[in-house]
Curated annotation (Swiss-Prot):
Gene behind the chain: CD55
Sorted UniProt keywords: Blood group antigen, Cell membrane, Complement pathway, Disease variant, Disulfide bond, Glycoprotein, GPI-anchor, Host cell receptor for virus entry, Host-virus interaction, Immunity, Innate immunity, Lipoprotein, Membrane, Receptor, Repeat, Secreted, Signal, Sushi
InterPro entries: Compl-Cell_Adhes-Reg, Sushi/SCR/CCP_sf, Sushi_SCR_CCP_dom
Sushi domain ranges (all copies): 35-96, 96-160, 161-222, 223-285
Alphabetized CDD domains for the sequence: CCP (cd00033)
GO CC annotation, single: cell surface
Signal peptide, first to last residue: 1-34
GO molecular function, one term: virus receptor activity
Sites of GPI-anchor amidated serine lipidation: 353
Organism of origin: Homo sapiens (Human)
Region (Disordered): 277-354
Name of protein: Complement decay-accelerating factor
Sugar-bearing residue positions: 95
Length: 381
């Protein structure tokens, strides 16, 4: 059977459509013979074209997941231009995922999850306690990636371990402001009058699989004052070998000496060093210059009647004598009497009447006065 061919007149209309058909063919061909076209679309990912417009054979294009999506581990994220101007096949490789799980101070992710970066909804991760912490059996150490791409709330399933009780310091104090759990710090001090030897603080640190204090307890040693100062002409009562804080030393003076200052001084502390509260007293003897000076005799005035040549005239002479007067002027004569005397001369004796009073004590007369008295008394003629 012979197929009828169209006649020339019938084929003419097709020639008029030839330019349009050629244009469609050219648009479908690659820009350069042997090039691949634009890379294929991948859900939730974008190709990294880096400004290229042609993709010759063996060209590799890598995709990057869009925001909030993460590459699925093990899935391809690139295509290659093959012979025949065709791209290699690629599957969807981006999916929604939680971010890296929350970092906890008390716990860390177990080994399988440390390097993982893809955590789709429903993923469960597990933690283990860090050194210095212990598991709380009643609480779960797991977290879950929720539908909102957030991790479930982490509870405190790991608790700090406790250091041993630090004990006590003799004559000192231990300050424990924050307890004795892992990471705690305690400080030491001594009572007044004692000096600290050792560390002033200690820390609760990791020691193997447990925790221990970093430093042992210090020692508080008593502070002593230097030997008390000795004093001249005195002694220390009940002297001892050592004098600690607030202990006192008492002084006493030898016989015949007087104490000047405080009888006692006591031991004090200044900048962890012992020192005495003050200087010791002094013992001073009785000075000769402190004796009462002797009383100097005052001049004594005595009225002594004198004898005149003329019996008709009478004259009384008053003389004043001084104990230390020179002999060239008068010779003092001392007489002591314990009674009061009154002498009256006889009438008609030719002498002037008078009265001589001698008081107890020392009475001094001049020689002339003494002779006159003796004549009056009839002892001399």
């Amino acid at each position: 059977m012979t197929v009828a061919r169209p006649s020339v007149p019938a084929a003419l209309p097709l020639l008029g459509e030839l330019p349009r058909l050629l244009l469609l063919v050219l648009l479908c061909l690659p820009a350069v013979w042997g090039d691949c076209g634009l890379p294929p679309d991948v859900p939730n990912a974008q190709p990294a074209l880096e400004g290229r417009t042609s993709f010759p054979e063996d060209t590799v294009i890598t995709y990057k997941c869009e925001e909030s999506f993460v590459k699925i581990p093990g899935e391809k994220d690139s295509v290659i231009c093959l012979k025949g101007s065709q791209w290699s096949d690629i599957e969807e490789f981006c999916n929604r995922s939680c971010e890296v799980p929350t970092r906890l101070n008390s716990a860390s992710l177990k080994q399988p999850y440390i390097t993982q970066n893809y955590f789709p909804v429903g993923t469960v991760v597990e933690y283990e306690c860090r050194p210095g912490y212990r598991r709380e059996p009643s609480l779960s150490p797991k977290l879950t990636c929720l539908q909102n791409l957030k991790w479930s709330t982490a509870v405190e399933f790991c608790k700090k371990k406790s250091c041993p009780n630090p004990g006590e310091i003799r004559n000192g104090q231990i300050d424990v402001p924050g307890g004795i759990l892992f990471g705690a710090t305690i400080s030491f001090s001594c009572n007044t009058g004692y000096k600290l030897f050792g560390s002033t603080s200690s820390f609760c640190l990791i020691s193997g699989s447990s925790v221990q204090w970093s430093d042992p307890l210090p020692e508080c040693r008593e502070i002593y004052c230097p030997a008390p100062p000795q004093i001249d002409n005195g002694i220390i009562q009940g002297e001892r070998d050592h004098y600690g804080y607030r202990q006192s030393v008492t002084y006493a003076c030898n016989k015949g000496f007087t104490m000047i200052g405080e009888h006692s001084i006591y031991c004090t502390v200044n900048n962890d060093e012992g020192e005495w509260s003050g200087p010791p007293p002094e013992c001073r003897g009785k000075s000769l210059t402190s004796k009462v000076p002797p009383t100097v005799q005052k001049p004594t005035t005595v009225n002594v009647p004198t004898t005149e040549v003329s019996p008709t005239s009478q004259k009384t002479t008053t003389k004043t004598t001084t104990p230390n007067a020179q002999a060239t002027r008068s010779t003092p004569v001392s007489r002591t009497t314990k009674h009061f005397h009154e002498t009256t001369p006889n009438k008609g004796s030719g002498t002037t009447s008078g009265t001589t009073r001698l008081l107890s004590g020392h009475t001094c007369f001049t020689l002339t006065g003494l002779l006159g008295t003796l004549v009056t008394m009839g002892l001399l003629t």
